[in-house]
Amino acid sequence: MKTTHTITQGDSRQMNLIPDRSVHLIITSPPYWQLKDYGTEHQIGFNDSYENYINHLNLVWSECNRVLHDGCRLCVNIGDQFARSVYYGRYKVIPIHSEIIKFCEAIGLDFMGQIIWQKTTTMNTSGGGTVMGSFPHPRNGIVKLDFEYILLFKKQGKAPQPTKNHKKAA
């Protein structure tokens, strides 16, 4: 069985070279907000306000929705982030994943759940672990963002069905 695969490099906010409803699966991991300079002009996230960061990501989700075939999937790997006190006057967790879910649902992508990707082990295998700090002051616990989400979305409509030959070859 012969298949064709094309790699197109460009800005995901404007995927003009990719026809409407021509992609069957999108897997993406957007740039982190304010954490990494990727060294490209007009990059998303670095030196952006949070609002601009989310607006740029929303342009990406709109383009993903346009190129995604009906009934097919978008998978987004994203982690929430601590906001520095410079931005909010205090430290807090910014739930970026919830912004993505809200926008994608608004443009017609159904949220199908998430996979939690535990990036490091936090299990104390020696048996002496503590939860939320240590006795007698557990209220001073440290929250670690050592996981990311893999958000799963499905575009409304009927997905293309594999042929008998495709099934047999798989």
Task: Please place each PLM-identified region on the residue numbering.
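Core catalytic lobe of class I
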Residues: 1-170
